[in-house]
């Protein structure tokens, strides 16, 4: 696969699971002889929600919740066919969203 790069974007709510999955992908790619750029941490997307504490009165009494989405990017430079096969067979943790672009 000369001249091609594989870009892998990972998203998760828990950064520990995300880092473990990233390490697993990096070790698999290095074992098959591919070069890796990254992991590059992307900005964390924070989504905040504000709701009333009480359903009837006290408009000033509110509660805030937030949802953080952590992201990482990996580039695999000049992958071998063994690298692609190993990445397809890889079983990552639940809760990690993986996008692969060739």
Curated annotation (Swiss-Prot):
Pfam families: Ribosomal_S10. GO terms for cellular component: ribonucleoprotein complex; ribosome. GO terms for biological process: translation. Keywords: Ribonucleoprotein, Ribosomal protein. GO terms for molecular function: structural constituent of ribosome; tRNA binding. Transmembrane segments: none annotated. PROSITE patterns: RIBOSOMAL_S10. InterPro entries: Ribosomal_uS10, Ribosomal_uS10_CS, Ribosomal_uS10_dom, Ribosomal_uS10_dom_sf. It comes from the Bacteria. Disulfide bonds: none annotated. Part of the 30S ribosomal subunit. Belongs to the universal ribosomal protein uS10 family. PANTHER family: 30S RIBOSOMAL PROTEIN S10 FAMILY MEMBER. Involved in the binding of tRNA to the ribosomes. This is Small ribosomal subunit protein uS10. It comes from Methylorubrum extorquens (strain PA1) (Methylobacterium extorquens). The lineage of its organism: Bacteria, Pseudomonadati, Pseudomonadota, Alphaproteobacteria, Hyphomicrobiales.
């Amino acid at each position: 696969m000369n001249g091609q790069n594989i870009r892998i974007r990972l998203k998760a709510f828990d950064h520990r699971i995300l880092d473990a999955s990233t390490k697993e992908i990096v070790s698999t790619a290095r074992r098959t002889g591919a070069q890796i750029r990254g992991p590059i941490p992307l900005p964390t997307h924070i989504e905040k929600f504000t709701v009333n504490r009480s359903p009837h009165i006290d408009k000033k009494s509110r509660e805030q919740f937030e949802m953080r989405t952590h992201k990482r990017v990996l580039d695999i430079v000049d992958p071998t066919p063994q690298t692609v096969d190993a990445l397809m067979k890889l079983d990552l943790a639940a809760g990690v969203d993986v996008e692969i672009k060739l």
